[in-house]
């Protein structure tokens, strides 16, 4: 029986990865982290999406204030607001939380070991325009080797799958449509991406700008737009 563990935030990317895993594995488990993030509403979305997908198991791990940094996601720093993708800052986005994916993947590997699987799925993407160092394929491969050596004594024992790594946001939208089919609107409407923690998205934070652009470029209305305070169109 094939098992996989998904690092699952309840956002667009991890929802797509979880749906894809459900198609490819017999059992799909997920782990979601609470780290005092500003957008804690994503925890509710993670629970709702997990139930909608019928995940075999779903664990919520409370990290509390363990992760610190200057990122507005885990501090009182102001969250950047932008009118369009053209205004997004170059380099590493200020929302970067140092060590976040290192910690998430380490704990995920621990849980995967307990489940008897070496397959971990995570929705990181190099085309995400945020410049996060821990979303690059070179980082993921290094983590897989280190975790494999540290947990199994075998650098190849843990496989960290990154199905969205080379995809644009528009391509991720199209993949979601393909994988979820008739359930696309139902499931994606439950997802949450906005860093400001606004249901349906604030439309101005880094995450909202990229999600909106991806759906527009794909020519697909985002199911969460119906919750947006201001009307959104393609």
From Swiss-Prot:
<keyword id="KW-0067">ATP-binding</keyword>
<feature type="binding site">
    <location>
        <position position="208"/>
    </location>
    <ligand>
        <name>Zn(2+)</name>
    </ligand>
</feature>
<dbReference type="GO" id="GO:0016879">
    <property type="term" value="F:ligase activity, forming carbon-nitrogen bonds"/>
</dbReference>
<dbReference type="GO" id="GO:0008270">
    <property type="term" value="F:zinc ion binding"/>
</dbReference>
<dbReference type="GO" id="GO:0005524">
    <property type="term" value="F:ATP binding"/>
</dbReference>
<comment type="function">
    <text>Catalyzes the ATP-dependent conversion of 7-carboxy-7-deazaguanine (CDG) to 7-cyano-7-deazaguanine (preQ(0)).</text>
</comment>
<comment type="pathway">
    <text>Purine metabolism; 7-cyano-7-deazaguanine biosynthesis.</text>
</comment>
<feature type="binding site">
    <location>
        <position position="194"/>
    </location>
    <ligand>
        <name>Zn(2+)</name>
    </ligand>
</feature>
<feature type="binding site">
    <location>
        <position position="202"/>
    </location>
    <ligand>
        <name>Zn(2+)</name>
    </ligand>
</feature>
<protein>
    <recommendedName>
        <fullName>7-cyano-7-deazaguanine synthase</fullName>
        <ecNumber>6.3.4.20</ecNumber>
    </recommendedName>
</protein>
<keyword id="KW-0479">Metal-binding</keyword>
<dbReference type="GO" id="GO:0008616">
    <property type="term" value="P:queuosine biosynthetic process"/>
</dbReference>
<feature type="binding site">
    <location>
        <begin position="8"/>
        <end position="18"/>
    </location>
    <ligand>
        <name>ATP</name>
    </ligand>
</feature>
<keyword id="KW-0862">Zinc</keyword>
<keyword id="KW-0547">Nucleotide-binding</keyword>
<dbReference type="Pfam" id="PF06508">
    <property type="entry name" value="QueC"/>
</dbReference>
<comment type="similarity">
    <text>Belongs to the QueC family.</text>
</comment>
<dbReference type="InterPro" id="IPR014729">
    <property type="entry name" value="Rossmann-like_a/b/a_fold"/>
</dbReference>
<dbReference type="InterPro" id="IPR018317">
    <property type="entry name" value="QueC"/>
</dbReference>
<keyword id="KW-0671">Queuosine biosynthesis</keyword>
<keyword id="KW-0436">Ligase</keyword>
<feature type="binding site">
    <location>
        <position position="205"/>
    </location>
    <ligand>
        <name>Zn(2+)</name>
    </ligand>
</feature>
